[in-house]
């Protein structure tokens, strides 16, 4: 059974045993919506049309977005360093460019490389006349030393890159060559751009990632039996996916509504 916990992640992480986590899957609040400065740039929608008025706020926060408050990254890394199994434990962060910059600056010597999640749908239609719609999200991989990685190739019937007769040429002139027909069955290495449809379902957390995306990362950055921690678990999709893949999932969420939904699901 997954371990489903409610509360401030920085406080609950303090209660977990040292060197107990094999993989951190983190989707920390970016701070894009939950601030009064950002609210000033957001417009209230009426019947799908921007009114030009500020969105309604409560205590300086956009309604429904009180969860989007940045956590103390220094305190976060302090707990990560205590909890990680060893110096090769991967710490994976979903982020946009602005928040990703803050993540790197907070632990620059631990940053290893980035991945891109290429979504099926773009967002930001209201700004489509000013900038391209956003259809990707960054995934940053951190570790104290080289992050553990367990290669898992993709399989399928891959499209041929070419299929034609070729003419070889040397000092003796053109020489007929046999038809080139590469074998496109079998396995291929994964690339740094992950093409995967986004999912939007009523009742899910606003930033929930697809189960298949979590599975992609979990299978490549952990082994069966490992412990996976999601410190801001939202709908706990990462935790349930970890359990399905024979890992031990631990999720922490402050919001009572999402916490109770996860409890009901795990019962």
PLM regions: where:
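Core catalytic lobe of class I
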Residues: 1-259, 267
């Amino acid at each position: 059974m997954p371990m489903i916990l409610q509360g401030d992640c920085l406080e609950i992480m303090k209660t977990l045993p040292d060197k107990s986590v094999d993989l951190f899957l983190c989707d920390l609040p970016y701070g894009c919506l939950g601030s009064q400065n950002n609210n000033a740039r957001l417009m209230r929608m009426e019947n799908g049309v921007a009114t030009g008025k500020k969105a309604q706020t409560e205590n300086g926060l956009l309604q429904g977005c009180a969860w989007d408050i940045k956590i103390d990254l220094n305190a976060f890394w302090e707990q990560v360093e205590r909890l990680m199994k060893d110096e090769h434990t991967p710490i994976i962060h979903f982020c946009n460019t602005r928040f990703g910059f803050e993540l790197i600056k907070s632990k620059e010597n631990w940053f290893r490389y980035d991945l891109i999640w290429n979504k099926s749908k773009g967002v930001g239609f209201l700004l489509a006349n000013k900038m391209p719609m956003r259809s990707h999200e960054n995934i940053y991989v951190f570790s104290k030393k080289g992050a553990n990685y367990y290669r898992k190739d993709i399989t399928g019937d891959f499209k041929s890159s070419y299929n034609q007769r070729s003419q070889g040429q040397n000092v003796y002139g053109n020489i007929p060559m046999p038809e080139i027909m590469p074998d496109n069955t079998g396995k291929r290495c994964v690339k740094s751009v992950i093409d995967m449809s986004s999912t939007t379902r009523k009742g899910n957390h606003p930033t929930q990632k697809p189960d298949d995306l979590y599975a992609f990362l979990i299978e490549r950055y952990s082994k069966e039996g490992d412990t996976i921690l999601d410190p801001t678990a939202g709908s706990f999709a990462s935790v349930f996916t970890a359990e399905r893949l024979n890992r031990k999932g631990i999720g922490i969420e402050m919001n009572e509504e999402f916490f109770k939904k996860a409890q009901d699901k795990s019962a």
